[in-house]
Amino acid sequence: MIEYGAEFPSVVQTAHKENNTVPIYAFVPKDRKDKVPVILILHYWGARDIKAERSMADRLAERGIGSVIVTLPYHLGRTPPGYRSGQLAIQPSSEQLRATMSQAALDVKRAIDFVEGRPEFDSAKIGIAGTSLGALVAALVYGVDSRPRLAAFILGGVDLAEIMWSSSLVVEARDALRRRGYSYERLQLELTEVEPLTYLHSRKESSAFVIGGKYDTIIPRSSTTGLIGAFDNPRTLWLETGHYGGIFIQSRVFKEVANYFETEFSGKPYLPPRRIYAPTLRIGVQAAYPTGFDIGVGIDLWKSNDRGDLVVVGLLTPRGPQVFFGGRVSQGLSLGVSGSTTRVGFGLFWSRVL
């Protein structure tokens, strides 16, 4: 695979000069004989490197498909001094959220301009793929720009206001919005111009591949199903994980993304697998009588349904391995029995699926 970098000025100029230049990284199959299809790859929020995106680029190159990784606003080399990568991308202000999403979409559109001018890429076969925040931006771009023919959304969704109002990752920003008098309805109204659903009706008949996490608390499941519902015939794949558990099957997921683009660009319909095995991993705290408090990491051994109304979890705790069996009380909270080879307790188990 041949790799080269480039950069261009952002369409939007901000108060932070580092954020005003867009680095991109292009990857071309080494043995290409003609122009190749190309995928714009967008990374997740807070990315500190592009290792995952390079892995996707490798998978695509194996299928004779090129790719271009686009650095999103306030991330990686666009991060101003004194801030973490992505820290300024999501702020408790509808005005700032609109500005960042608009800048991201315009930067990706300019990256598509770049692709169209390169002799190694086939401008008639452009796709877009994003993970998490990258999937949100990809959905917006797919709605406002007709040049990408195909799109893959990994752990993404729609309804930005719902994500801000429900995600377990933006608690501080959500609390700040509430202190400023925001409601979900007000935020939804003020984000209309950067909401993917505002524009995706134009792509209702277009191809799309949506990969969601059944137990995702960062991108709410309702947001992912909303994205699925924006298309007439989307390809879908639900992982038995939360937002982070997919890292354990990243290679398999990227393989399916590459399968999707290769198949659909060839003019054939892509059929996703019914499921990809992924362990459902949890971190949790239990309070049981008479055994007391414990923290642990665990794996689901059995559950009665997708909601986990009844669940058996194998746990590794500082006191040794344990098994918890219980029933769901509310989101993330179960009541039941936990035990090891030497003791048994009855109580509560709070957990979050990774």
What are these regions (language model features)?
Residues M1-D31:
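N-terminal cap/lid segment of alpha/beta-hydrolase-fold proteins
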Residues K35-Y44:
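Short beta-strand element of the alpha/beta-hydrolase
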Residues W45-A105:
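Cap/lid segment of the alpha/beta-hydrolase catalytic domain
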Residues L88-A129:
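Gly/Ser-rich "nucleophile elbow"/oxyanion-hole loop immediately N-terminal to the catalytic nucleophile
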Residues V137-S183, W238, F248:
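Hydrolase active-site cap/lid region
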Residues R203-K204, F209-G212:
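Short beta-strand/loop motif that positions the catalytic acidic residue
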Residues L227, F293-D306, V312-L315, R319-S338, ...:
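Feature captures outer-membrane beta-barrel proteins of Gram-negative bacteria and organelles
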Residues G242-F254:
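Catalytic histidine-centered segment of alpha/beta-hydrolase-like enzymes
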